[in-house]
Amino acid sequence: MTNPAPLAARYTDPSPRSLRPVEESDFAPSNAERVLLTGASGMLGRESALALLRAGYTVRVFQRSDSGIAALLPDTIRPRFEQVRGSLTNRQAIEQALTGVNGIVHAAAKVSVSGDWRDYERVNIEGTKSLLDAAVEHAIPKFLYISSPSVAHAGAALVGAGNGDASPEHARGNYARSKAVAEKAVLQMNGTALSTGEHLCTSALRPHLIWGPGDTQLVERILERARAGRVPLLSGGTGLIDTLYIDNAADAVVHGYERLKALAGRAVVVTNGQPRTVAELMSGFCTAVGVPAPRFSVPAPVAVVAGRLIEKVWALLP
């Protein structure tokens, strides 16, 4: 996978794949295998679809709205890209999407810092289980689930945090808890016998803090607050944090899918493997777009109390 350049350079260096125009020469010949990718409207879904196409797969995306991917593809590659619109809460739409599929990469999820538990349960848990059940009915032997380190990380600052078993009981927030339940369901289905005589092979990837061109989550939120002067550094920003550049995340999806047998029944945390201080991370993002980097610091105990108060307020909102 790509070894990331310094953060400030990463946005201006034209070499990253995600910043280059999509060209026909990037794509391997078709390998005649069709992969269903759920949730292709976001940054990870879009780049994963392109990475799978580059690797020679036919890719069928499944989400509620147009992914916009077809417009990026050369005319000769476009026949290998398919799109089915539908929701994970609609079993009939799932059945339609799985026809003729050889494997599944499940990235779709309800992602938000707040919301009613039932909404997370319906999409992230019940939707995943419905997709799993349909995969067994259609005798589809490959199922790669895109999870999150938050399913096994309760907030402790530890090297390797997030690489333990998914724990719904200790996960923080509805998103993490629902993803933890779903991941456990995916891994428990590993080895399920299929009508073809094969067995279902499942694994989970836990990408950590994905960022890159097109990001509307991590980077966009940091920059929005930095422009308004509202980004404090916790204890001076000295804490270490690892992230995952989008090119590496998309490569991990392809490698994980192609190595499902080796990863069967397991979850894998994916990062750049280059921990940086929070101050360096934020400074790099801000410098790259000409925004002043955060300078004021908040003591950790104050931030913890404020965070707990915010969590309680969110819980009271409709």
Where are these regions (language model features)?
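N-terminal Rossmann NAD(P)H-binding glycine-rich loop of SDR-like oxidoreductase domains
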Residues: 27, 33-55
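NAD(P)H-binding glycine-rich loop region in Rossmannoid oxidoreductase-like domains
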Residues: 82-126, 134, 154
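Short-chain dehydrogenase/reductase
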Residues: 119-125, 161, 171-183, 209-212, ...
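Conserved Rossmann-fold NAD(P)-dependent oxidoreductase catalytic core, especially the SDR/UDP-sugar
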Residues: 126, 130-177
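Flexible, glycine-rich beta-alpha linker
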Residues: 152-153, 200-221
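Active-site Tyr-X1-5-Lys
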Residues: 170-203
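Substrate-positioning beta->alpha
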Residues: 182, 215-221, 235-258, 265-269
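Mid/C-terminal beta-alpha module of Rossmann-like enzyme folds, strongest
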Residues: 256-318
